């Protein structure tokens, strides 16, 4: 099935709000094996929305709109869809009941009540996080327009609870989708290794990059879940085999989830000392369920005095080599492990930017160290080409720290480099 997305909102068009809705919907469509043709963004203008909708209906089996379902005058998506499809708005009794339950004893303004009116023939999607229901409106045979609310906190539950099951039923097939997640290989190298696998129609294999990682989604369709999984799993195994030990998991939420689970299984503990990452690594760890079992201490030692007092980094080492140096990174990793009684210590120091760099130590240079009782490992992240920003540098450094620990606990070489000219030892 072919799909298009129309994102509605002047705030999106002008860049005042980042359009995360399109990314969420696009990922959902990909998981269902649908072919996403285009993403349109239109302002709060009925004429332009109508033009975009008519254009999309000429090409797609499913058109998904996001935004414009609220109670204000500039929320006009339903009215426009109703006009284009010739499906006048009608009061939807169940949606009205839910709206009244939401407000309880509070009075409901007249403009709020319009949220309970849906195009004739709609399949309603309840909104468990807000007031505006979504809906699917039939167009010509085999064609649907799906209307979703704009706030991600409302859109995401509706996607999961209602829209994806609805599209699966309309597609007449059960979908099995597997996400192979990697760290340590670029999209170009990965694509070359699995090029022949991406040519298949069922399962489909789609690589893409995000946040310094590379993912491969394998999606299969069949009459039932068991048959779909049976189609997908040999291809998943082939992808894993081609990519090797840069694969850190399938259908896992991230490196941090894998590392926390490894620590729990090995009954090991972790302490962290951060400088340029400012606590991001500790946050990623503590976001995971069960982190309290394996993670006891996370220190942000930004100042040299803090590195010495809290971690035992020698003053003469800081004076001789500077805070951004392999020597200090190693001392941070060893110090945090020894002083706070952990099995593993991670230390990060660098120049996250945008200022503070020198010719000798440019912006983007980061040292990441891992310490255990009998060894210390180091990775050096050197800027490659243009500087990609402070947040990118911090995220990349924290991912390298997690990957070093993952690889050690999996019995893999810790100091393995990166492909595609990305940061390496």
Curated annotation (Swiss-Prot):
Highest taxon above the source species: Bacteria
CDD domains to which the protein is assigned, alphabetical: cinA
InterPro entries: CinA, CinA-like_C, CinA_C, CinA_KH, Competence-induced_CinA, MoaB/Mog-like_dom_sf, MoaB/Mog_dom
SUPFAM superfamilies named in the record: CinA-like (SSF142433), Molybdenum cofactor biosynthesis proteins (SSF53218)
Gene3D superfamilies: 3.30.70.2860, CinA-like, MoaB/Mog-like domain
Similarity-based family: Belongs to the CinA family.
UniProt cross-references to HAMAP family, sorted A to Z: CinA_B (MF_00226_B)
Cited NCBIfam families: cinA_nterm, PncC_domain, PRK00549.1
Protein name: CinA-like protein
Organism: Desulfovibrio desulfuricans (strain ATCC 27774 / DSM 6949 / MB)
């Amino acid at each position: 099935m072919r799909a298009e997305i129309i994102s509605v909102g002047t705030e999106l068009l002008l860049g005042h709000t980042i359009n995360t809705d399109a990314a969420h919907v696009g990922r959902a469509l990909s998981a269902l094996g649908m072919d996403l043709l285009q993403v349109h963004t239109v302002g709060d203008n009925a004429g332009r929305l109508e033009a975009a909708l008519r254009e999309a209906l000429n090409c797609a089996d499913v058109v998904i709109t996001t935004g414009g379902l609220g109670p204000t005058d500039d929320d006009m998506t339903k009215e426009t869809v109703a006009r284009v499809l010739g499906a006048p708005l009608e009061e939807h009794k169940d949606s009205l009941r839910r709206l009244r339950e939401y407000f309880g004893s509070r009075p409901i303004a007249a403009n709020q009540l319009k949220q309970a009116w849906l195009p004739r023939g709609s399949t309603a999607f309840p909104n468990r996080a807000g007031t505006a229901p979504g809906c699917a409106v039939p167009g010509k045979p085999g064609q649907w327009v799906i209307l979703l609310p704009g706030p991600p906190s409302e859109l995401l539950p509706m996607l999961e609870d209602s829209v994806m099951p609805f599209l699966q039923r309309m597609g007449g097939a059960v979908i099995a989708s597997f996400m192979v997640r990697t760290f340590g290989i670029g999209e170009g190298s990965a694509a070359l290794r699995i090029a022949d696998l991406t040519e298949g129609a069922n399962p489909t294999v789609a690589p893409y990059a995000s946040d310094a990682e590379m993912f491969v989604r394998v999606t299969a369709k069949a009459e039932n879940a068991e048959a779909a999984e049976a189609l997908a799993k040999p291809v998943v195994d082939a992808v894993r085999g081609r990519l090797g030990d840069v694969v850190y998991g399938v259908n896992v939420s991230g490196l941090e989830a894998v590392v926390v689970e490894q620590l729990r299984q090995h009954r090991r503990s972790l302490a962290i000392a951060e400088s340029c990452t400012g606590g991001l690594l500790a946050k990623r760890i503590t976001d995971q369920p069960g982190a309290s079992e394996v993670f006891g201490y996370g220190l942000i030692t930004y100042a040299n005095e803090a590195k010495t007092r809290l971690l035992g980094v020698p003053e003469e080492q800081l004076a001789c080599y500077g805070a951004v140096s392999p020597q200090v990174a190693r001392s941070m990793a060893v110090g945090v492990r020894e002083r706070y009684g952990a099995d593993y210590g991670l230390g990060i120091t660098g120049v996250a930017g945008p200022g503070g760099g020198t010719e000798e130590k440019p912006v983007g240079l980061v040292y990441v160290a891992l310490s255990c009782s009998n060894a210390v490992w180091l990775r050096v992240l050197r800027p490659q080409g243009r500087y990609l920003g402070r947040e990118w540098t911090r995220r990349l450094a924290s991912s390298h720290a997690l990957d070093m620990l993952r690889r050690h606990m999996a019995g893999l070489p810790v100091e393995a480099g990166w492909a595609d000219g990305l940061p390496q030892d």
